[in-house]
Amino acid sequence: MLYKIGQIIRENNNYIKNVGIIIENPILVNEYTVNENLSYLKKMSKNSNDINLDEWYKFFGIEEYKNTLFSKLSLGTKQKVGLIQAFMHKPHNLILDEPFNALDKGTVEKVQKYLLEEKEKGTLIVFITHINDSILNYCDEVIEIENGKIIKINKK
């Protein structure tokens, strides 16, 4: 359930549609192709007419996989599809759980550049990672948690 200042907002579709989420191992429908999965999600977006999936496939270099079943993809390609799913509707808020998991160096650099551009536009980015170096350029604040407790807060 989603809360904002003690208020349940789960029913507020406008707020929910403004959040892009990627989890460590993206989960989509295994029996659907990449294009079927993302086209379905695209239809649910308020700005679906502005989403060009072919541009995202090109950005991530996965044009050749768009008609491949999600279950047949490598972990790195699944991660790219998960990132498209999180980014394609240009959300105001991003929650990224280990977004660079299984990605090659070139893709990591492209995603880092994209995230810096989105941050400059005012996108709120919440990073969940074990690799501190991968987030330092994006963060105004880093909160380190160990065993469920905050152990350190670093602010720029």
Model-based region annotation:
Residues 39, 50-65:
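Conserved ABC ATPase "signature" region
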Residues 94-98:
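Catalytic Walker B motif of ABC-type/P-loop ATPase nucleotide-binding domains
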Residues 129-130:
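H-loop/switch region of ABC-family ATPase nucleotide-binding domains
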Residues 83:
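Hydrophobic anchor residue at the start of the ABC signature
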Residues 69-75:
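Conserved ABC ATPase signature
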Residues 105-106:
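Helix N-cap at the start of a conserved alpha-helix in ABC-type nucleotide-binding domains
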Residues 25, 31-44:
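Q-loop/switch helix immediately C-terminal to the Walker
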